Every structure is written in structure tokens, then in C-alpha cells.
Amino acid sequence: MEFNLVTIGFTIVNFIILMLILKHFFFDKVNKVIDDRNNEVALTIKKADAQNEEARLLKVESEKNLEDSKLQGKTIVENYKVKAEKVSEEITAEAKTEAQNILERAKRETQREKEKAEDEIKNQVVELAVLISSKALENSINEAEHRKLIEDFVSKVGI
């Protein structure tokens, strides 16, 4: 194995020339492509991080809005529940009042009917007593005296 310095020198020169040519035509362009790609990846990562942060903030805001909505819904339901109970109590009170009024009217009507029936019975008793006594006495007392006697009798009896 012999080392030829001239061959080694030409090989080194060829290698340097090749490197310069490659650097001039390829390495700068390849490095530029790699740098551009690195920048693009870094930018994409920044955008993704920004979007993740935005999504996190939106999620927090949405959760807060959801909690607020739940609280509002609960408040609305409670308000309507209170209103419904109040309306129910008012309706119940009105119904009780109406029922009481109906009962009072029925009692008054019953009392009137009772008094009317008592008056009617009293009149019939008086007429019947007059008829019976007139037949029994056969004209011994006049009718006015007879009626007075019967009315006294009826008032004492309590009819």
C-alpha cells in the first residue's frame, strides 16, 4: 500500500471543490428549506398553544356561563314555585270563602223555608181550628172572637 501524495492532494482538492459546489448549489438551499420548515413548525406550535389557551379560556367561560344558567334556572323555578303556591293559596282561600258563602245562603234559605212552612202550618192550624170550633159551637161565638181564641191557643202551644 503506497501513499501517493499527489493523488491524496488532488483528492483533497476535488473534495474541497465538491464541497464548495455542493455548498453553493445545495447546502444553502437545503439549510434554507430546513430553517423554513423549523420556523413553520415553531409557528404551528405557537398557534396550537394559542388555540389551546383560547379553547381553555372558552371552556372556563362556558362552564361559568353554564353555572350561571343553572343558577338562573333554579332561581326562576323557585320564583315560579313561590308564585304557584301563592296562586294556589289564593284559589283555596277564594274557594273556602265561596263555600262559606254558599253555606250561609243555604242556611238563610233553609231558615226562610222553615219560617214560611211554620207560618203556613200556623195558618192551616188556625183555619182548621176555626173550622172545627165553628162546627162544634155552631154559631154560639162570632167568628172574630173565635179567631182570637184560636190565635191565643196557637201562641200558647207554640206552633
Curated annotation (Swiss-Prot):
Transmembrane segments: 2-22
GO molecular function: proton-transporting ATP synthase activity, rotational mechanism; proton-transporting ATPase activity, rotational mechanism
Keywords: ATP synthesis, Cell membrane, CF(0), Hydrogen ion transport, Ion transport, Membrane, Transmembrane, Transmembrane helix, Transport
Location of the protein in the cell: Cell membrane
Cellular component, GO, one term: plasma membrane
InterPro entries linked: ATP_synth_B-like_membr_sf (IPR028987), ATP_synth_b/b'su_bac/chlpt (IPR002146), ATP_synth_F0_bsu_bac (IPR005864), ATP_synthase_B_chain (IPR050059)
CDD domains assigned: ATP-synt_Fo_b
Primary residence: membrane
Membrane association type: Single-pass membrane protein
HAMAP family noted in UniProt: ATP_synth_b_bprime
Subunit record text: F-type ATPases have 2 components, F(1) - the catalytic core - and F(0) - the membrane proton channel. F(1) has five subunits: alpha(3), beta(3), gamma(1), delta(1), epsilon(1). F(0) has three main subunits: a(1), b(2) and c(10-14). The alpha and beta chains form an alternating ring which encloses part of the gamma chain. F(1) is attached to F(0) by a central stalk formed by the gamma and epsilon chains, while a peripheral stalk is formed by the delta and b chains.
Similarity remark: Belongs to the ATPase B chain family.
Record's function text: F(1)F(0) ATP synthase produces ATP from ADP in the presence of a proton or sodium gradient. F-type ATPases consist of two structural domains, F(1) containing the extramembraneous catalytic core and F(0) containing the membrane proton channel, linked together by a central stalk and a peripheral stalk. During catalysis, ATP synthesis in the catalytic domain of F(1) is coupled via a rotary mechanism of the central stalk subunits to proton translocation.
Protein known as: ATP synthase subunit b
Organism, scientific name: Clostridium acetobutylicum (strain ATCC 824 / DSM 792 / JCM 1419 / IAM 19013 / LMG 5710 / NBRC 13948 / NRRL B-527 / VKM B-1787 / 2291 / W)
Lineage of producing organism: Bacteria, Bacillati, Bacillota, Clostridia, Eubacteriales
